[in-house]
Amino acid sequence: MTEAIGDEPLGDHVLELQIAEVVDETDEARSLVFAVPDGSDDPEIPPRRLRYAPGQFLTLRVPSERTGSVARCYSLCSSPYTDDALAVTVKRTADGYASNWLCDHAQVGMRIHVLAPSGNFVPTTLDADFLLLAAGSGITPIMSICKSALAEGGGQVTLLYANRDDRSVIFGDALRELAAKYPDRLTVLHWLESLQGLPSASALAKLVAPYTDRPVFICGPGPFMQAARDALAALKVPAQQVHIEVFKSLESDPFAAVKVDDSGDEAPATAVVELDGQTHTVSWPRTAKLLDVLLAAGLDAPFSCREGHCGACACTLRAGKVNMGVNDVLEQQDLDEGLILACQSRPESDSVEVTYDE
């Protein structure tokens, strides 16, 4: 366990990566390419702990003089199918302490604590046609999905990408290279506010109308995502076809060592957990949350916020009953399908079975 200056001790689930490359994408955005400090044979970070899917994110621990550190989630722009290393892209924001710190101070050789890749903004298959809608730095997870779909799938990919002006376009050269490599499969539609004004729902609807039979992935600032959702609703695109990525600032410290609440007098429940193809049985104190129990047992259960906001810890309840304290992300359809948030679930039955592998 590593001690963190000004913070609680770090948990065993925390990983330390090294910045191998810093790429200036625009005047306001930089990509950070990561490497394992001691190489791929580092026993502290086996390759399975860095496995990820297109559309997922890393949670970074950024130093802070005021609080010791802050935790922020940044989408992976790299693709597990085309890139050797994990990479995230960070864009400056007016009030964004962490993003500004990374843009000002991140340099090659710097080590930074991260959590394992996580997130549910992931296509169920890459062999499909896609409609990808991005604005500003929202291109980051969209780029990962785009590269992966083109490399591994055989379908058509249409990307609508909105920016303030031409100088604000992140990955401009990379998108041109992809369009040249896949001229019959990739269509890129740029929207520049300097020329076209803010993208409205009606304008977006006209542009995306030919592509409404596809899975849709949306990421960008709130007003853009709302306009995109309104456009798709006007076109009667089914809600289950639309996937949206939203990040919230984390209030708790997901890097802190896990403390299992076992203060209750009632006998613990039993949790049977299927994770990465293996089945584990753990004792589950009635007052403890499932995620804390799994992490304390040394299992690499996925998570990010621990606050019920992001959905990264979602798993499927196969048997038994649980009580969720906070749920800001799962919709009724998800609940009907048995999804629960491990970071918010406490047992209500003596035995509970869940799986992360569905």
UniProtKB/Swiss-Prot annotation:
[2Fe-2S] cluster binds at residues 305, 310, 313, 343. This is 3-ketosteroid-9-alpha-monooxygenase, ferredoxin reductase component. The keyword Metal-binding applies. Binds 1 FAD per subunit. Keywords: 2Fe-2S, Cholesterol metabolism, FAD, Flavoprotein, Iron, Iron-sulfur, Lipid degradation, Lipid metabolism, Metal-binding, Oxidoreductase, Steroid metabolism, Sterol metabolism, Virulence. It comes from Mycobacterium tuberculosis (strain ATCC 25618 / H37Rv). PROSITE patterns: 2FE2S_FER_1 (PS00197), 2FE2S_FER_2 (PS51085), FAD_FR (PS51384). Its EC number is 1.14.15.30. Monomer. The two-component system 3-ketosteroid-9-alpha-monooxygenase is composed of an oxygenase component KshA and a reductase component KshB. It is an enzyme of class 1 (oxidoreductase).
